[in-house]
From Swiss-Prot:
MF terms (GO), sorted A to Z: protein-folding chaperone binding; zinc ion binding
Name this protein carries in UniProt: Uncharacterized protein C24H6.02c
Alphabetical keyword list: Metal-binding, Zinc, Zinc-finger
Keyword Manganese: no
GO biological process, one term: protein stabilization
Residues involved in Zn(2+) binding: 82, 85, 107, 110
ZnF locations on chain (DNL-type): 71-166
Organism superkingdom: Eukaryota
InterPro entries, alphabetized: Mt_import_TIM15, Znf_DNL-typ
Annotated source species: Schizosaccharomyces pombe (strain 972 / ATCC 24843) (Fission yeast)
A Pfam family per the record: zf-DNL
Length: 175
């Protein structure tokens, strides 16, 4: 019986098969396709580099050091009260999205969406953040550094009291 999923899988495999993974073959990138568990007709693809192709040819799995692993991306946490239903909630979003993209957060109770930042100019003619919006309304916006545990802010420090990491003793001894 013919199925779209099997045809796509065979098509992906045929396109990915290389006769020789030697140095003569310049493999800039490959796509590895695997079916999505939820829906067999959707395919997820992962890009492989030339070094991955060499590892596949030699049969040795590549082990990356801790330095090569991805570092956690900086995130922001905002706690706000929905103006529609007066529900207080916490939301996380990336620092990159807040400073370069458009961020909307959804109230968990009334499902209303609130604009936090719009640097892509989707909702207005100028780039705005929640700080600008609240300043125009005359409301306050508190910034700081802290810890959020189980949805509650445990420790909050204003920006001028940012805790800096202690200098290591090896850098002090080299002076």
């Amino acid at each position: 019986m013919w199925s779209f999923a099997r045809y796509t899988q065979k098509f992906c495999l045929r396109n990915l098969q290389l006769k020789n993974f030697s140095n003569k073959v310049k493999v800039s990138s490959l796509l590895f396709c695997s079916p999505n568990v939820r829906n067999i007709s959707n395919w997820q693809c992962k890009r492989f580099t030339q070094s991955d192709a060499k590892d596949l040819a030699s049969g040795v799995p590549s082990v990356k050091s801790d330095a090569d692993q991805l570092q956690p991306k900086p995130t922001y946490n905002v706690s706000f009260t929905c103006t529609v239903c007066n529900t207080r909630s916490n939301h996380n979003f990336s620092k990159q999205a807040y400073h370069n993209g458009t961020v909307l957060v959804q109230c968990p109770k009334c499902k209303n969406r609130h604009l936090m930042a719009d640097h892509l100019k989707i909702f207005s003619e100028e780039r705005v953040t929640i700080e600008d919006i609240l300043a125009k309304k005359g409301e306050t916006f508190k910034k700081g550094y802290g810890q959020v545990i189980n949805g509650n802010v445990v420790e909050f420090k204003p920006p001028q009291f940012k805790i800096r990491p202690a200098k290591s003793s090896s850098s002090n001894s080299s002076k």
